[in-house]
Amino acid sequence: MSDRLKPLIGTAATRPLSREEAEFAFECLFEGEATPAQMGGLLMALRTRGETVDEYAAAASVMRAKCHKVRAPNGAIDIVGTGGDGKGTLNISTATAFVVAGAGVPVAKHGNRNLSSKSGAADALTEMGLNVMIGPEQVEACLMEAGIGFMMAPMHHPAMRHVGPVRAELGTRTIFNILGPLTNPAGVKRQLTGAFSPDLIRPMAEVLSALGSEKAWLVHGGDGTDELAISAASKVAALEGGQIREFELHPEEAGLPVHPFEEIVGGTPAENAQAFRALLDGAPGAYRDAVLLNAAAALVVADRAAHLREGVEIATDSILSGAAKAKVALLARLTNAA
């Protein structure tokens, strides 16, 4: 332990930290050079004042540098949300990942266990028979053979062990609640990323731009979810060519009907997995349409589709042809053989 972080705690409470100051601060956190009290003091100083893009980018860049990295195919995309929206929906981004992979786009998905629902990405995948507790080499093998891999956050970010207990004791949101989607161990350059607050989508797009992303959609559903909503219009901050464009997106623009929010509310991991299996078998309804909407957006971000309606067509074929279901079966086999 050292006192190197201490001077920056007071500074962080009164003014934004520069990129260099913030990088130094998070180096201290991730190297275990700060006491729990100092870590908590810094995190709450940042939260109370309000984190800046430079601070987000600094934390993400340090976290990326210290992670166990994964090599992914060119053009790989991450489909992920911050969690923390408190809505308890079915596993939309997880299902979307397999539909997109079934359409031929490599998906390097970063995730964790439940944050905003009874069943997070890792919970759902475990229930579907996948082994999520695998390391970088095994994930790389999955990406190369199946075109999809799941990176369980704790398996790739060992430096978080210093911060985890402090986050648990604080019991409130901190900068780390949005760092997951910004710190993909595969370093993908394309993202469909959901945020629990509409106020985060522009800053997160700016952070991804600063970190080298080529194309990304940062989204927040009008139903309060951290994904494109099927029950309301969604807010989008689209990054492309270093420029960020903000707009609202309605399901009908993709040729999809609006459904009541209640129709995508999830349950236990077992219940969500049952709904996921039905979706893969082609069951129509709100869940499938929500996945089609998000998959269409991901396909646009991946340049696999020129527009959302084409994306919906491609995603529908991925489901009805059995391609998405085959990806689940293949990934289950590969992860359990690891």
UniProtKB/Swiss-Prot annotation:
Cofactor list: Mg(2+)
Residues where Mg(2+) 1 binds: 93, 227
Annotated InterPro entries: Anthranilate_Pribosyl_Tfrase, Glycosyl_Trfase_fam3, Glycosyl_Trfase_fam3_N_dom, Glycosyl_Trfase_fam3_N_dom_sf, Nuc_phospho_transferase
EC class: transferase
Its biological purpose: Catalyzes the transfer of the phosphoribosyl group of 5-phosphorylribose-1-pyrophosphate (PRPP) to anthranilate to yield N-(5'-phosphoribosyl)-anthranilate (PRA).
Quaternary context: Homodimer.
Name the record gives this protein: Anthranilate phosphoribosyltransferase
Organism placement in taxonomy: Bacteria, Pseudomonadati, Pseudomonadota, Alphaproteobacteria, Rhodobacterales
